[in-house]
Amino acid sequence: MKLHSQFLKLHSRHGGAAEASVTLDELAHTLGCTHRNALNVINKLAGQGWICWTPSRGRGRRSSLKFLAGAEEVALSSMMQAISSSDIRTAVEGIRGHARSSSLQDTLQGWLLAYFGYHSEQRSDKRIDTLRLPVRQQLHNLDPLYMNLLAESFVSSHIFDGLVARSGGQERINPGLAHTWDTNEPRTVWTFHLRKDVLFHHGKVLAAEDVVFSFERMMITSQRMLYSNIFKDIWEVKALNPGTVRFLLKQPNELFLPFLCTSRAAIVPRDLETALAGSFGRRPVGTGPFKLVEMNEDLCTLEVFPYYFQGRAHLDRVEILHVPWNIATAAPETSSAFHIVHNPSAGSSAEWSRIHSDYSVRKFVTCNTKKKGPLSDPLIRADVLACLSAGSDSLGKSPVDSDTVRAGNDAAATALQIATIPQYAGDAEAVAAKLNGCGYCCRVLSVSPEEFKGPVRLQADLIVFSLLRDQDEQLRLFDLYSTMVQHLEPRTRADIEGRLRLIAREPDNEARAAGFREIEDSLREKHQLHILYEKPAETAYLPSVRGVTFNSQGWVDLRHLWFPPEL
């Protein structure tokens, strides 16, 4: 593929004319090599029939270079070689570097996407079913304790299990690694009885001490984590015997059991993290339906775990690949092998069947009223949020009387800092553009999820983030508001913290939901929260896919997915 790249470099520099007149010095400079190596490359390209080279003798004399092959032809050949050898990084970089036109880029992306989807092959009279699934988020860490991204949670949910579980669209909590559980009347003591002979991927049998280890490492971590306000209510985890675990809570918390259904509360083996010397996040071992066999910055490969306690998955192998562009912009037709796409664009092929997973993503802006600055003034906040509402379909508009709009206020001369993470940088830039158009001066600061958990939010004026409205919505709202109070002025903070304490003790699901709505309404009335927009999370799939179900986050559940054989 190096020869392909060298051809494309020459074509990019000298391919504009039917025949180019070049010196050896110019060729060496273009290729970034010596005269001797440049001649070797020219001879190889001529041998491939890609160029015609007519040399002229003498130093500095110009020779004739004629291109016999087109750049698209050679680029496509290079990409196909990369795809055939599963070198996705090279393929992606090639598309970025050599696609000089949108039509070529679409062609190359289409070829790459053909690599994805369902593939079946025979090995020793056995059919091996493989699903290649692209994700836009790069996987960094699959440790339930440290993962930050939804894509990481998606993969982790197929490697690990929790004590209890929920299926997509169901409020009822079902047995997981625990076959049953009970609690005392004050609901501060929870006892879980484990299934027998559940195996981890490395052959160890699950025991109560593994559960104790999994939760104790949560309780002692100093890292800011999703749902930390829930598991910080755990006073003690104790193994009563190899098959029984008891949790003692500091106070009743009706979100405790739903928390145990999340991928954050997955059970890990107590002996493995030490043995792997800190690399557990990239070499995880759980009890789930798939085990990880390979993970690098571009590819995560899962293989079926045949001894899974809830039955073997239908797929034999799942390859999850990082593809940085929006998959839907190059979606293949129904004749392609590409079967599953997350979050397809509205322009995807009409031949695709779509189903909503009943979950949505809400993007919002919050104001830092704890910081001394222009947004500590409610009238300025009202004006800022009114600017964001103007001419949009955003939810939760903050209506402001025209007499209170202060378009010429001193805040316009003060730079407002907008903090977010890279995944939401586009939304933050759109917010900045709207406010700039209203006379404000804004600067976007995009930091990693880890940095975002630190003081960055407290130093910003506006924070752009999102809420996944899935089956864990109440947990996410509790975590969101518990975090948000850190950048709110004391009176509002005390009010919200009091409401959250009541919600945590409320056994009725609908009453808890009403409590969260009251918090949202209060923040909107005080111009401290503005919802930018909300859109459903969808999954597109072709008719040949069977067993499409969703996990609690709205992702396709791979353990039930299967493809009928060609008969």
What are these regions (language model features)?
Residues Y307-S349:
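Ligand-site clamp/hinge motif
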Residues Q138-E152, K204, F256-S263, A540-V556:
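A structural "hinge/loop" feature
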Residues A17-A20, V41, N148, T180-R224:
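Aromatic- and charge-enriched surface segment that lines or borders ligand/interaction sites
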Residues S64, S228-D271, E294:
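Surface-exposed binding/hinge segments that line
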Residues Y146-L150, F154-H158, V164-G169, C261-A313, ...:
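Gly/Pro-rich hinge or "lid" segments in bacterial periplasmic/extracellular proteins
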Residues P134-T183, E216:
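N-terminal lobe/hinge region of extracytoplasmic solute-binding protein
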Residues E303-P306, R354-I380, R501-L502:
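A bilobed periplasmic-binding-protein/Venus flytrap-type ligand-binding module shared by bacterial periplasmic
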Residues S56, L113-G117, D383-A407, G426-V431, ...:
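Detector for C-terminal structural segments
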